[in-house]
């Protein structure tokens, strides 16, 4: 399990966001308080952060290494994940 619907959170007023990176790749992401199926890779950076005042790291699947999104660290020390929605699949056990 990557994450669960119960861990959805609103960041900057919404759970869902659409952003483009500096190369023009567009991502629809959802924000989650937890994503135990993700591992953060690399050092946190503020470069091109989509959420002002946050640092980010790439988040990959712990099982296969697929890029699933980003882990964000807020100035108050809190964290959340911005996960690429079309890379997440719901299974019966996480629909409850």
Predicted regions, residues:
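A short Gly-Trp-Pro
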Residues: 1-96
